A protein has these predicted regions:
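Charged, terminal alpha-helix-loop-beta segments
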Residues: 1-516
Length: 516
């Protein structure tokens, strides 16, 4: 290999999210607010007089019992033995089990002392009644599934690991904590096989960077509408057609038909909200049920831009005019839009814009939108597309009363996903509120609602350290806002909670498909 390319394989592995290190996973687990870990990297002689040292990755307390945790990646070579012998992980867990039983009394006393010290210092500690503290004699193995794509080989590997671990379940406990995208893909494909999609078949065509290919998680073109909750299937397609909205990931390049992708966040958003878009009371209950809303809302207003009267939620909403220098708004394509939109008045009679951004299994690698090139000959390295974006949005950010201003926006957080979307949507809502000429949806205020499953750790718990000092997506974004209460992150199940009793059939469908 030529010397100048020698670092390529190493960098590919370094920046490949499937190759995230065990230490990085461990650090992310510790930094999360829940569960709280009492200790990490605990090391101790196996027993008095022994030279052998044993080490646990994490220690926590559950139900007044000390739990010792070993962490492994799904791809770790120690999880399986290539020639069929007992894998190293089994021997390792057996050693942990014997160590805990041998030293249980000493471990309880040690951790009582550590607990009191951390409590005195005001450090995070798990809930516990120290007088009742005992020890769980079975160590717990946490396996992090870092796979981003599902293959038959990977499924076989996971099944073999589970089979071997189950044979030793009397000695230790284990859990595979997955990559949310991978887990949801498995759930959706299982539902597809179980006729949840009314007999729809996978194997549809997806047109992506690698051209046109068939995938088992893409519905066949004739089954595409079965990607929707049954009562909305015909109406949602008509809505997009009548309002001139292009579909994301459409079965055809012209955006005229819905996506057959069963993990589409656009489809997920519509399945959650489209059914209630004309139910004024349901929409009001929905937004007043969101914890942390900066106002209490009195009335939901119909959205004038819709093709039919009486719509209280709009989808792929754009502004009535070009506020962001984007060469004209087109719903669903090539401009800033919001996945869903609600228009309301508060108890004081003042109008609010409520743009909703919807995420499902998305996660993002580092990609600087301010340094992107145009495609074509002679464009590489000129950052033409990035410079266009900088010229389009930088002045708007500098005049914003919500976004923190920076001395230079090249490579900044505002031009990295998912923040690039959030930045543009914030400017979108702010510019409409500030405009004296806005006649379609004039408003005095806005609140930005970001819907994302709380289990999507690759998106929410990622440390965007290249562009932020804060850990996690929510903290990183709120650090860039002057009024943090105008941004609300919520799980879709929590969003729909006010409708559990009034829309049982809808919520049962959503629970079966999305909330497991």
């Amino acid at each position: 290999m030529p010397r100048k390319f020698a670092s390529v394989p190493k960098n590919c592995k370094k920046y490949n999210p499937e190759e995230i290190s065990e230490k990085k996973i461990q650090g992310d687990m510790i930094c999360k607010k829940s569960p709280v870990y009492l200790d990490s990297e605990f090391a101790h002689r196996y027993e008095d007089g022994s030279c052998k040292t044993i080490r646990f990755d994490l220690v926590t307390i559950r139900d007044n019992k000390l739990v010792f945790i070993e962490l492994k990646r799904i791809g770790d070579d120690r999880m399986l033995d290539k020639i069929g012998n007992t894998p190293e992980i089994i021997r390792q867990m057996d050693n942990y089990c014997r160590f805990i039983k041998t030293n249980s009394d000493a471990l309880v006393e040690y951790y009582k002392k550590l607990y009191r010290i951390k409590q005195h210092l005001g450090l995070p500690i798990p809930q516990c009644d120290l007088d009742k503290l005992s020890i769980c004699t079975k160590p717990h193995l946490v396996i992090r599934n870092t796979y981003l794509k599902e293959t038959s080989g990977r499924n076989s590997r996971i099944n073999n690991i589970v089979r071997i671990l189950l044979a030793h379940r009397n000695e230790f406990t284990f859990a595979i904590e997955g990559n949310y995208h991978f887990d949801q893909l498995h759930i959706q494909k299982t539902l597809l096989e179980q006729v949840f999609f009314d007999g729809a078949k996978g194997g549809g065509i997806w047109h992506g960077h690698n051209g046109y290919k068939k995938y088992p998680h893409i519905l066949l073109e004739e089954d595409i509408q079965k990607n929707f909750y049954r009562p909305i299937r015909d109406e949602v397609v008509k809505y997009f057609h009548d309002n001139g909205i292009k579909w994301w990931g459409a079965a055809k390049d012209d955006g005229s038909r819905p996506s057959g992708h069963i993990l589409s966040s656009q489809i997920a958003c519509l399945n959650h909200l489209f059914c209630i878009r004309k139910d004024k009371e349901a929409v009001l209950a929905l937004i007043n049920g969101i914890t942390g809303m900066p106002a209490h809302f009195k009335e939901i207003l119909p959205i004038p831009s819709e093709s039919e009267a009486g719509c209280y939620i709009a989808f792929e909403m754009v502004s009535s005019r070009d506020y962001l220098n984007e060469d004209g708004p087109t719903r669903g394509a090539n401009c800033t839009s919001v996945d869903a939109f609600i228009y309301a008045t508060d108890d004081n009679g003042e109008r609010w814009l409520i743009p909703i951004e919807w995420k499902y299994t998305e996660s993002y690698q580092r990609e600087d939108k301010s340094a992107e090139d145009y495609k074509g000959r002679g464009q590489k390295g000129k950052h033409g597309k990035g410079e266009k974006r900088l010229s389009r949005y930088s002045d708007l950010i500098n005049s914003s009363e919500q976004l923190i201003h920076l001395p230079d926006y090249h490579g900044s957080i505002y031009f990295q996903e998912p923040f690039y979307q959030l930045m543009r949507q914030t400017l979108w809502a702010e510019q409409i509120c500030r405009s004296k000429d806005e006649s379609v949806i004039p408003a005095q205020h806005f609140v930005h609602v970001h819907v994302c499953p709380k289990d999507n750790a690759l998106l929410l718990d990622k440390n965007y350290t290249d562009v932020s000092k804060e850990s996690g997506m929510e903290n990183a974004w709120k650090a860039m806002l002057k009024h943090r209460n105008l941004y609300i992150l919520i799980d879709p199940k929590d969003l729909m909670r006010p409708l559990y009793d009034t829309h049982k059939d809808l919520c049962n469908y959503l629970s079966e498909r999305y909330w497991k």
